[in-house]
């Protein structure tokens, strides 16, 4: 027989924060958003792995690839590379993040010499970048034969079918540097020759990287970036409950710092088996999150099974239709509040703190602050990050407005993988996600900075300088 709750569940949109006393020290510049990512024991000096900002990007094809992971790690958060791809491809993305050299950009705008001005304009419209590498085969690491920038053509005076080879700046007229050039040396060359960009090539003239003048300031040390002990960017990776025996070792070998089981419903034997395998093979050296759950029982099940963090939320995502298709889920605010209470009780009883992640239901920036105040240690976002330049999808023009493609892991586009499978027939018989578009919003850095400035300001209004204080303030007045 079904259990009936006495009260309906609630979403973030049904709540507002009541302001509290703000001391003279309570200003945004003094607010710390550092938060634990994985579990730790009482008395431990510090959490084994923490975030500098409480934001992580969702385990989705349309959100988290290596480019997103690098951009978010620079800001202090972490991306979980999507697992709905081959093991080899996911491991390669992880490896690219771990081997990334800050300041050295792999070109994402490349054409061959036989392409036309029309192709250049379409590529610029798609990527938003005005510097296009011309390589023999049109690939990012092909033999460099020239470069096209906006100074190389005038649309009003040229035919769209003009070959790139006729108006590009040829290689012999370019200032280039060796692929082993240091960032400082590259920046010195840029300033000495008044360049906007400097291509780095190997001994065979194959393009390796670009260094851009506009990125100079961002190459300076960013005190908020999330680095491992070897000064490499921290990156996560999604896994499923089917091929984990092969996928997990490959991702660990590639350098993944933390894993997360990607499933719409985590209160299951399949997740326990996955956690059991990882603990038996690696002990506590491999950090892995699990989920999703929406209540106390689900949290305790995963915490006792060995999860390093637990994701909270079912059906709350903007492109998730699990609630419509199955009639399961829970209002995100209610789910977070209940699971946070269970986490605190578990910590009091065992001395083990298992962080929770609110996944889904964030529509406005202030919902982030609410999620933190209600007890979430960090927040997983899909639609939010899908809007940015760094997401892996195409930017398209729809009725005069720029949009980014966005689809759910339960959609037909991603349905051949295991996120929504409970076992048995591998073919998914119905969708739990949809294809959509989200308004293009520009760069990740600018938007994350704006969103977090709102979070810090609101925390000051509530008299809190740290997330845990924010939660305590809310609980004391609830």
Regions found by a protein language model. Give the residues of each.
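Catalytic beta/alpha-barrel core
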Residues: 80-85, 109-111, 131-133, 176-178, ...
């Amino acid at each position: 027989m079904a259990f009936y709750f006495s009260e309906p569940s609630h979403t973030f949109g049904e709540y507002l924060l009541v302001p509290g006393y703000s001391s003279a020290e309570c200003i945004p510049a003094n607010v710390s958003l550092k938060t634990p990512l994985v579990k730790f024991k009482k008395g431990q000096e510090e959490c084994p792995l923490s975030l500098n900002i409480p934001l992580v990007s969702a385990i989705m094809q349309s959100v988290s690839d290596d480019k997103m992971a690098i951009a978010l790690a620079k800001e202090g958060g972490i991306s979980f590379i999507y697992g709905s791809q081959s093991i080899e491809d996911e491991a390669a993305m992880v490896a690219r993040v771990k081997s990334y050299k800050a300041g050295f950009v792999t070109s994402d705008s490349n054409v061959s010499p036989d392409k036309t001005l029309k192709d250049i304009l379409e590529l610029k419209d798609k990527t938003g970048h005005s510097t296009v590498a011309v390589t023999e085969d049109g690939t990012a690491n092909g033999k460099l034969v020239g470069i096209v920038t906006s100074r190389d053509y005038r649309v009003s005076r040229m035919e769209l079918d003009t070959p790139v080879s006729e108006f590009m700046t040829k290689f012999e007229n370019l200032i280039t540097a060796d692929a082993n050039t240091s960032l400082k040396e590259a920046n010195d060359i840029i300033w000495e020759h008044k360049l906007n960009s400097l291509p780095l090539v190997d001994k065979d003239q194959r393009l390796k990287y670009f260094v851009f003048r506009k990125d100079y300031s961002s190459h300076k040390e960013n005190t908020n970036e999330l680095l491992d002990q070897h000064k490499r960017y921290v990156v996560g990776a999604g896994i499923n409950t089917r091929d984990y025996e092969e996928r997990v070792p490959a991702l660990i070998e590639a350098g993944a710092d933390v894993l997360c089981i990607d499933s719409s419903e985590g209160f299951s034997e399949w997740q326990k088996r996955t956690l059991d395998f990882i603990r038996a093979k690696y002990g506590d050296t491999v950090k892995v999150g699990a989920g999703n759950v929406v209540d106390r029982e689900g949290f305790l099940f995963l915490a006792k099974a060995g999860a390093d963090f637990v994701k909270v939320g079912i059906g709350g995502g903007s492109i998730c239709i699990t609630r419509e298709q199955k009639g399961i889920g829970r209002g995100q605010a209610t789910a977070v509040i209940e699971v946070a209470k269970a986490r605190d009780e578990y910590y009091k009883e065992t001395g083990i703190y298992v962080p929770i992640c609110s996944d889904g239901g964030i529509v406005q920036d202030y919902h982030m602050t609410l999620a933190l105040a209600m007890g979430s240690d960090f927040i997983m976002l899909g639609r939010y990050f899908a809007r940015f330049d760094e997401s892996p999808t195409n930017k398209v023009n729809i009725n005069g407005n720029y949009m980014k493609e966005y689809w759910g892991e339960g959609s037909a586009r991603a349905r051949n993988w295991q996120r929504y499978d409970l076992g048995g027939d591998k073919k998914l018989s119905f969708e739990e996600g949809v294809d959509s578009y989200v308004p293009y919003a520009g760069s990740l850095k600018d938007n994350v900075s704006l969103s977090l400035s709102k979070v810090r300001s609101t925390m000051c209004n509530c008299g809190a300088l740290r997330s845990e204080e924010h939660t305590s303030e809310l609980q004391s007045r609830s």
